[in-house]
């Protein structure tokens, strides 16, 4: 009986993937986000005429604007 319960517990953990963390691009590399970070962001700006600034990473909250794009799936902020 204990073996059956243990097997069911292991199967449940594997199926639910309790340790899942979002993966986002940050500085051109894929990073694993902290558990409370549910969004990837991609922010583009031009602080100077000939300089395009791109910021990418993980965020716990995200507001979408013209320059800031938000998404919630792995590697979606390229």
Curated annotation (Swiss-Prot):
Impact noted for substituting residue 48 to A: Important (34-fold) decrease in inhibitory potency of ASIC1a
Effect ascribed to mutating residue 51 to A: 5.1-fold decrease in inhibitory potency of ASIC1a
Keyword NADP: no
Marked site: Key residue for inhibition of rat ASIC1a, probably binds to rat ASIC1a F-350: 53
Disulfide bonds: 24-40, 33-58, 62-70, 71-76
Site (Important residue for inhibition of rat ASIC1a): 48-49, 54-55
Entries under Gene3D superfamilies matching the protein: CD59 (2.10.60.10)
Signal peptide feature range: 1-21
GO MF term list: ion channel regulator activity; toxin activity
Result of altering residue 49 to A: Important (19-fold) decrease in inhibitory potency of ASIC1a
Pfam families: Toxin_cobra-type
Family annotation (InterPro entries): Snake_3FTx (IPR003571), Snake_toxin-like_sf (IPR045860), Toxin_cobra-type (IPR054131)
Tissue: Expressed by the venom gland.
Subcellular location(s) per record: Secreted
Superkingdom, natural source: Eukaryota
Keyword terms of this UniProt record: Disulfide bond, Ion channel impairing toxin, Pharmaceutical, Proton-gated sodium channel impairing toxin, Secreted, Signal, Toxin
Additional facts recorded: Negative results: has no effect on rat ASIC2a, rat ASIC3, rat ASIC1a-ASIC3 and rat ASIC1b-ASIC3 channels, as well as on TRPV1, P2RX2 (P2X2), HTR3A (5-HT3A), Nav1.8 (SCN10A), Cav3.2 (CACNA1H) and Kv1.2 (KCNA2) channels. Does not produce motor dysfunction, apathy, flaccid paralysis, convulsions or death upon central injections (intrathecal or intracerebroventricular) in mice.
Name the record gives this protein: Mambalgin-1
Source species of the chain: Dendroaspis polylepis polylepis (Black mamba)
